[in-house]
Each structure stands twice: as C-alpha cells, then as structure tokens.
From Swiss-Prot:
It is an enzyme of class 2 (transferase). This is Acetate kinase. It catalyses: acetate + ATP = acetyl phosphate + ADP. It is found in: Cytoplasm.
Length: 400
C-alpha cells in the first residue's frame, strides 16, 4: 500500500462525502456518503475492499457523528488505513478573491473561509464544521489539513469577465463580482483534455462543460480560465436541476411587488424550485427528461430550454478563443451520461464545425471517456471528472 493516502472530505449542509485515495496512483481504498443530517433517518453508506455497507447514524446526527463513525467504526475495521493517512483534503466551495490555489489550513485560512461564507451560505459553514471535526478526530494530522477551493481555478479571469456592470464601489467595498464554481472539475478535465488532444496545457483552447445537478461552462484559453458561467454564487448561468440560471433580474421585483412573494420565497423559488424541476413540474432528474423527450411535452420543453442555453454559452465562449477552439469537453453526471444533451446542444453549433457521431456519442457513457465527433470535424470529448483525485493530489503535494 502507498504511503500517500489522503482522506478527502466534502461537507455539504446536510451530507458528508468521504474517500481515502492514493494521491500517487488514484486508487480508492474507501468511499462513502453520510446524509440526511439533522433528520430521523440520518445514515451512512460506504464501500471498502469492494464491499458495500450502510448503517443508521441515529436521529438528528450530523457531521460530528458521521466523522466519529468513520474513525471509530469504519476505519477500526482496517486500522492500517488510518495509520497510513498522510493528509486530509477539504473541498471548499467559495474562497472569495483571496485564494488562487489550494492552501494548508491554519487560523487565517479558517477566517478566510468564514469571510467568504456570505457568498456560499449553505456550503462554507458546513466546510468549517468539517475542518473542526477533522482536527478533533485526527489530531496527528492537525497541520496536514488542506483547503481546495472550487473558486481558485477561475481566479485567472480578466476584469472584463468577472466585473458586473454595477457601481464599481460594490466590487471594491463588498467583493461583488463573478467567482464561478466547479473549478476543481474544470481544472481536472483541462489537464486530461491536453493529454487526449496531445497538446501542452499552456497551448490549449477549450470550452469545458461541467453538467450535473449544478452546471457551469468555462472558457479555457492557453490552459487558463478566462470566463465561466456561474457568478457571485452558483445560481447564475445554465439551466440546472433546481436552479434557474440566467434570468432578467427584474423578474425578482415583479415576483415581490406584483405577486407579493417574500425575498426568502423568491430565493427558494430560484434555487430549489426552478431549472428542470420548474420546467417539468415533476422532477429535477435529467434522466426523466431524456427518457421522455419524444413522448412527454414537459420533458421536451425542459430539454429544449436546457440545450438552448448550453449551446448559447458554448457559442459565446468561442469568441474568447483567439480564433482557435481545440475542443468542447463534457463532464459531470449529465455531461458524462446524457448523450441526448450532448447531441442536441452540439447540433445547434454546426456553424462552428461540430458534428456528433451517434455511435461514438452513445459509447461515451457510464464512466467511459472518448471523442464523440465525426472524423474530420471539430473535436468534442467526454471526460469523467475526478475532483477527489485533484483534492488528494493537492493535499499530498502541499503537506509533503
């Protein structure tokens, strides 16, 4: 077994994803999910040595109970795993402007994560709980905890990409600007695309589409992010599972003034009741939309709006490529599996030289990477993301 084992933690407001990964070869020794925190059905599921197990955490359990269970129950089954841990990597959704790369966690970093919490009110406070609990559970690794920021990869954006056309003082005094998200995923697939296209990363011009329950598109020029669709928060941009993405901001005033909705109700509407769920009025699941596209009006409506928005972003970002677009990359749960989304979206972009090969497109699903374009047309690639590996590698590198 390698001596570069890293515990990767991804704390959400009501869940905790965890894995132990070899940062050298990417092998996963443990993976799992604790979920339904603060509810009677709080539970934990994990896979170790190919065996899947699950257990109840007890009513109302949360991050502390989950980490206790990982340390005292799961890792107790295999003490050599615990003994070989060299670092802990924490996924942090928002690092504000301060963090342009991953950092070893100390008091100032904890304060920085707190300072950015207003931009990620559901996520950052949960990350801080995860850090606090990890420091308690693994005292021997107290100076080996690393924060990996979802916003860091986008910090290379130029001013014209990240500024909103609002009074400049709002940016200077309050940090209101575009930050983006999914940066770790966009970074990973950029590195992988360079290998598949046989080009040095620093010469790579691509558009990366991370499509999951949340979704974002990034423009990568010479290997660096120059624009991305998510904004101050992950609400801007594409149509998502339950998020609206781009809307006319005046809709908010209309909902408030004319329909009498409260600010909290509007926030809930835009973040939890819109997107595919809002358009279908049934589900946020893209599989339903794909499976029922030909037979159900709600599914067709949702898919058409989704792909229209995605194609618009890809088209717009070609303008930032300095005249050379090497490929479009699809990743994330929808990007990797929804062949119809890829085909319909790229079908709108024939003017840019995209032509999807139907068979190749169907083959590149369920964890398989590959080119999905017809021979001789502009490359379109599917690359399964691996954010956990990036987090493990950064944690290992910074604590070596």
């Amino acid at each position: 077994m390698s001596s570069k084992l890293v515990l990767v933690l991804n704390c959400g407001s009501s869940s905790l994803k965890f894995a132990i990964i070899d940062a050298v070869n990417g092998e996963e020794y443990l993976s799992g999910l604790a979920e339904c925190f603060h509810l009677p059905e709080a539970r934990i599921k994990w896979k170790m040595d190919g065996n899947k197990q699950e257990a109840a955490l007890g009513a109302g359990a949360a991050h502390s109970e989950a980490l206790n269970f990982i340390v005292n129950t799961i890792l107790a089954q295999k003490p050599e795993l615990s003994a070989q841990l060299t670092a802990i990597g924490h996924r942090i959704v928002h690092g504000g402007e301060k963090y342009t790369s991953s950092v070893v966690i100390d008091e100032s970093v904890i304060q920085g994560i707190k300072d950015a919490a207003s931009f990620a009110p559901l996520h950052n406070p949960a990350h801080l709980i995860g850090i606090e609990e990890a420091l308690k559970s693994f005292p021997q690794l107290k100076d080996k905890n690393v924060a990996v920021f979802d916003t860091a990869f986008h910090q290379t954006m130029p001013e014209e990409s990240y500024l909103y056309a609002l009074p400049y003082n709002l940016y200077k005094e309050h940090g209101i600007r575009r930050y983006g998200a999914h940066g770790t995923s966009h970074f990973y697939v950029t590195q992988e695309a360079a290998k598949m296209l046989n080009k040095p990363v620093e010469e790579l011009n691509i558009i990366t589409c991370h499509l999951g329950n949340g979704g974002s598109v990034s423009a990568i020029r010479n290997g660096k992010c120059v624009d991305t669709s998510m904004g101050l928060t992950p609400l801007e941009g594409l149509v998502m599972g339950t998020r609206s993405g781009d809307i006319d901001p005046a809709i908010i005033f209309h909902l408030h003034d004319t329909l009498g909705m409260s600010v909290d109700a509007i926030n809930k509407l835009l973040t939890k009741e819109s997107g595919l769920l809002g358009l279908t009025e049934v589900t946020s699941d893209c599989r339903y939309v794909e499976d029922n596209y030909a037979t159900k009006e709600d599914a067709k409506r949702a898919m058409d709006v989704y792909c229209h928005r995605l194609a618009k972003y890809i088209g717009a970002y070609t303008a930032l490529m300095d005249g050379r677009l090497d490929a479009v990359v699809f990743t994330g749960g929808i990007g990797e599996n929804a062949a119809m989304v890829r085909e319909l979206s790229l079908g709108k972009l024939g003017v840019l030289g995209f032509e999807v090969d139907h068979e190749r497109n169907l083959a590149a699903r369920f964890g398989k990477s590959g080119f999905i374009n017809k021979e001789g047309t502009r490359p379109a690639v599917v690359i399964p993301t691996n954010e956990e590996l990036v987090i493990a590698q950064d944690a290992s590198r910074l604590t070596a």
